[in-house]
């Protein structure tokens, strides 16, 4: 079974959505992330991490608020933000990292 560390350490660009089931803005991000995945396909991997279930990972990356989005490649944090982002804004942010 793949671990969180395995996933973020890969060659592929990985967008991690740190969320909570009780968080209303997190629920708003869900369809936006699905749309981003539709546009980018295999060029990115998107995973969701429930901060209440995976407290160690959330703590390790200093997650203070949800949703928090982080981009990883080779285990390195390339970018991070907290709060809801619109699809166009998120795609524009990710695009330079796809090259």
Walk through the language-model features, giving the residues of each.
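Typically the conserved alpha-helix immediately C-terminal to a functionally engaged Cys/Sec
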Residues: 27-40
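Short pre-active-site segment immediately N-terminal to redox-active cysteine/selenocysteine motifs
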Residues: 12, 19-22, 65
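Non-catalytic, surface beta->alpha helical segment in thiol-disulfide oxidoreductase systems
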Residues: 71-99
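Hydrophobic beta-strand anchors of alpha/beta hydrolase catalytic cores
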Residues: 15-16, 46, 69
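Structural micro-motif
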Residues: 61-70
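A short beta-strand-turn-helix
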Residues: 1-14, 55
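Structural microenvironment flanking redox-active thiols in thiol-disulfide oxidoreductases
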Residues: 51-58
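Residue-level signature of catalytic and energy-coupling elements of molecular machines
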Residues: 16, 33, 50, 75
């Amino acid at each position: 079974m793949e671990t969180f560390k395995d996933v973020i350490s890969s060659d592929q660009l990985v967008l991690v959505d740190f969320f909570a089931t009780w968080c209303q803005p997190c629920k708003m991000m869900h369809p936006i992330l699905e749309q981003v995945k539709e546009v980018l396909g295999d060029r990115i991997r998107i995973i969701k991490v429930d901060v209440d279930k995976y407290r160690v990972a959330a703590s390790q990356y200093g997650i203070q608020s949800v949703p928090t989005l982080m981009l990883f490649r080779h285990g390195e944090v390339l970018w991070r933000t907290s709060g809801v982002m619109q699809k166009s804004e998120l795609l524009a942010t990710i695009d330079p990292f796809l090259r």
